[in-house]
Amino acid sequence: MELTLWTYEGPPHVGAMRVASSMKDIHYVLHAPQGDTYADLLFTMIERRGQRPPVTYTTFQARDLGGDTAELVKRNITEAVERFKPKTLLVGESCTAELIQDQPGALAKGMGFDIPIVNLELPAYSKKENWGASETFYQIIRTLLKDKANEIDKINPQRWKSLGRRPKVNILGPTLLGFRCRDDVIEIQRILSEQGIDTNVVAPLGSSPDDITRLTDADINICLYHEIAETSCEWLKRNCGMEYTTTIPIGIKNTINFINEVHEKLDLPLTNQKELEHKSKLPWYSKSVDSNYLTGKRVFVFGDGTHAIAAAKIAKDELGFEVVGLGTYSREMARQVRAAAKELNIEALITNSYLEVEDAMKKASPELVLGTQMERHSAKRLGIPCSVISTPMHVQDVPARYSPQMGWEGANVIFDDWVHPLMMGLEEHLIDMFKHDFEFVDGHQSHLGHTATKGLDNKVDEHAQSNINVQKKGNIIWTDSGRAELTKVPFFVRGKVKSNTEKYALSKGLPEINDETLYDAKAYFG
């Protein structure tokens, strides 16, 4: 067990709650102590829903452990079924309750209810939240479709032609507390509709047990988030013959590839790629003169597997950035992330320690960080611009407005969210450069908010001091002229310049670093 201030994922029962809360006519009885009810806040505070999750907690206390906690479980299950009248009941236990070994799922199945009961056995001490969501979704589909899967013939993706209707697809994977899932679904449905393709079921988000039984009415499945839906898609393919897409439509190129993959599976004619590219502003901007400032910017990427891989591809192929770091906290996606990192000639970082990620960020010296809310805090400490691309996230990353990550509009949102921090970084550097000019006025407001630029001065001074405060490295001394020249370097690349200059001085055997050494090192490293 490891003590930490932050964690990227909660225990697996939180993943189960995400799936249950995303669906209708379903209820989750969770065998858990009082302290585990904190998860409700995730949905009301961060997701900002107007209703609490459909979860009943047994909320046993220390004094209950001396009695029969199994009776407590059965009483809560009975009350939940009578009060909420769900069409499907999920039963599981939290990490604490797992130690008691009451086996609430087995108890529920022996109580004689005439509704499907899904027994969730989620190993709390070896698995985490995304795995828990994936396993819950899979168990729901398996329970509700098991009999039907044995009766139907294998599904032909082109059967829509013989049936005389438009092709239909299922969109699988979006859940509450996922990164922009609600808006992604709207964007993907819009794109599919433009291609003459209907949506049969979206699940888990907004679906019911009745909808799950209709999954086989579709021709293919869209696996929108691999962390959540891939296991279910594989089961549907194996047992029902349903093909599924693997391309994640984040970014212009991947959206085009996604549309082509859907067309190929459904045997539809392929679309004109040039026409599709004009549906977003990102391709135009990346080719414009204004974007030259951004070419070659060093970017560090960390998040869940789906968004991290997509972000790295967009950064390299669509915006011309140099990806200097790529990683994920999701062990289930480690293989795919390692493969993506290998294509970029870098080593993938697979860890659930935010401190390891922060150390990797320091060593990579990026000019932009694309990560979770934890990387936003780390980047702020290091003075590096950051944009959040993945869960875990805070309330500011769940906008009330329409703000997808997928499709054409998603590319526009990404274009704004990634480019603006870099442009603002340039503005801060210009303020830093000219703040000593006699015409510079302290009272002018900063783009950072309603604070005067005096606060910004202090912040920039902190960045400068944190990057040049070390006077010696080994036997090398920074002279006054060297330190003065270093302060002229933009704060978001100053650490890299300082490190390279010290390496250069060590390799040349120089006892001190002055302004000339800085120029020589710059010429040496290019």
Swiss-Prot record:
Q: Which Pfam families match?
A: Oxidored_nitro (PF00148), PCP_red (PF08369)
Q: Which SUPFAM superfamilies match?
A: Helical backbone' metal receptor
Binding of [4Fe-4S] cluster occurs at D36
Which reaction(s) does its UniProt entry say it catalyses? Answer: chlorophyllide a + oxidized 2[4Fe-4S]-[ferredoxin] + 2 ADP + 2 phosphate = protochlorophyllide a + reduced 2[4Fe-4S]-[ferredoxin] + 2 ATP + 2 H2O
Q: Which GO terms describe its biological process?
A: light-independent chlorophyll biosynthetic process; photosynthesis, dark reaction
In the record, what terms sit under GO molecular function? 4 iron, 4 sulfur cluster binding; ATP binding; metal ion binding; oxidoreductase activity, acting on iron-sulfur proteins as donors; oxidoreductase activity, acting on the CH-CH group of donors, iron-sulfur protein as acceptor
Q: List the InterPro entries hit by this protein, alphabetically.
A: ChlB/BchB/BchZ (IPR050152), LI-POR_suB-like_C (IPR013580), Nase/OxRdtase_comp1 (IPR000510), P-CP_red_C (IPR042298), Protochl_reductB (IPR005969), Protochlorophyllide_Rdtase (IPR016209)
Membership in a protein family: Belongs to the ChlB/BchB/BchZ family.
- What is the designated name of this protein? Light-independent protochlorophyllide reductase subunit B
